[in-house]
A protein has these predicted regions:
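Conserved beta-strand signature within the Rossmann-like core of class I S-adenosyl-L-methionine
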Residues: 162-176
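A short glycine-rich, Lys/Arg-flanked "PGG" loop and its adjoining helix->strand segment in the class I
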Residues: 152-166
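S-adenosyl-L-methionine
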Residues: 103-151
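Conserved class I S-adenosyl-L-methionine
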Residues: 76-86
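A basic, amphipathic helix-loop patch mediating RNA/tRNA/ribosome contacts
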Residues: 1-46, 79
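Core SAM-dependent methyltransferase catalytic element
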Residues: 216-235
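Conserved SAM-binding loop of SAM-dependent methyltransferases across substrates and taxa
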Residues: 87-98
Length: 235
């Protein structure tokens, strides 16, 4: 049976049109994975659930979720490393998109959402600096969302771990102290932001990376800082 029909038949939507709209808005899970095609065939025994209007455990999840609405990255059956996992926003989205397992690394402790921490697909490494992290695991994709440190400082540590990367570039930690900021620490110097982004892009190229996408995050940082997703892989 089609997913939109199943939603209507199970009284999860008031009409087939509303059921279709829910699917297209990525608000429907089948067996814990987001399905975005109304014509997806549901089998007997499949578990269908609706996602709340804001299902994310953190702002990071909102950022990545919004990015992936316009930029496809294949997570299905992949082993993902989440660097700077914190509450687990990126990890949550990875699982919703079909990741097989997610390794969560963060220098902090007791931050990861309890629901994620209890998920068997999650491996939690607390009080762990990525620069000292080692694993025999083959990592298919590295997600990176770190604060209070430049991406330059950890790039050499994450490069050997995988061949594909999606990093959140945060100008507030990249432009240096001389850049003009407001009282909340938001960088106001647009030229400094663009220069810092260009410099990092050029740095990746010197390291023989192919840049697939650079996109301003549709969801800004907590205090209003502009941030950028950079998707890159080994050339």
């Amino acid at each position: 049976m089609r997913l939109d029909y199943a939603l209507f038949n199970q009284h999860l939507a008031n009409s087939r049109e509303k059921a279709k709209a829910l699917v297209l808005k990525n608000r429907v899970l089948v067996n814990k994975i987001v399905i975005s095609k109304p014509s997806f065939i549901v089998k007997e025994g499949d578990q269908i659930e609706l996602i709340a209007t804001n299902p994310f455990v953190s702002r990071a999840g909102e950022k990545l979720g919004a990015f992936l609405e316009n930029h496809f990255i294949d997570f299905k059956e992949k082993v993902v490393l989440d660097v700077g996992a914190s509450k687990g926003g990126f990890s949550q989205v990875a699982l919703l998109k079909g990741a097989k397992r997610v390794l969560c690394v963060d220098v902090g402790k007791m931050q990861l959402d309890e629901g994620l921490k209890n998920d068997q697909r999650i491996e939690c490494y607390e009080e762990c600096d990525i620069r000292g992290f080692k694993t025999p695991e083959k990592i298919d994709l590295v997600l990176c969302d770190v604060s209070f440190i430049s991406l330059y400082c950890i790039l050499e540590a994450i490069v050997p771990l995988s061949g594909e990367f999606l990093a959140l570039f945060k100008p507030q930690f990249e432009v240096g102290r001389a850049a003009k900021r407001n009282k909340k620490g938001v960088v106001m110097d647009k030229e400094a932001i663009l220069n810092a982004l260009e410099n990092f892009k050029n740095h990746l190229k010197t390291k023989d990376f192919q840049i697939l996408t650079i996109q301003e995050s549709l969801v800004k940082g907590k205090n209003g800082n502009v941030e950028f997703f950079i998707h890159f892989k080994r050339a």
